[in-house]
Amino acid sequence: LLFPSSAAAPGEFPDQWIHGSKSAMDNTDPPVQVHRYNDHTYILRENKAINYEGAFMYVFFGNGVALLIDQGSTSSPALFPLREVVDELIANWEAEFDQSSTHLIVANSHLHGDHYAAWNQFVDRENTTMVGLTHEEVMHYWGFSNYPDERLEFDLGGRNFVITGTPGHQSS
């Protein structure tokens, strides 16, 4: 697969995100909303009836590799089956684009619990790299030596990303 790097990847946002219900018992929405932004990018949303944060997560695909950014606010696979959803996305993407054995990288935008609660669902997954849950592990994985001033290029199977530190409410 070829991924042009000269421009942003075009895509479509949904008309509406699920919002859950006042009570999880009355909720009829799926625990994870899956939106295909484009052929190789998915935006996931945690149902707000499961956790008020309603976390967003992202899955990016490149040749032979996928990157999951963030794992939501709920650790329980029974309530929030994120790994099941991600595994199904990978299987469907592989079938559509004649790929196999896609390696998964599990990373976080920053290290707050509402972004990595379902991390535990992936720790025993084969063919998976867990970037880490400490500032030091994250800096080492991406290769930062002058964070946050440095901008690094990351090759996700022929799909190039720029990794950079940004001001926010968490150091990594």
Residue map of PLM features:
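N-terminal low-complexity, Pro/Thr/Ser-rich intrinsically disordered segments
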Residues: 2-27
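Short, flexible coil/linker elements and helix-boundary hinge sites characteristic
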Residues: 3-4, 31, 98, 143
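Generic structural motif
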Residues: 4, 32-34, 41, 104, ...
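Hydrophobic residues at beta-strand termini and immediately following loops
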Residues: 44, 148, 166
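Active-site-proximal loop/helix segments of hydrolase catalytic cores
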Residues: 167-172
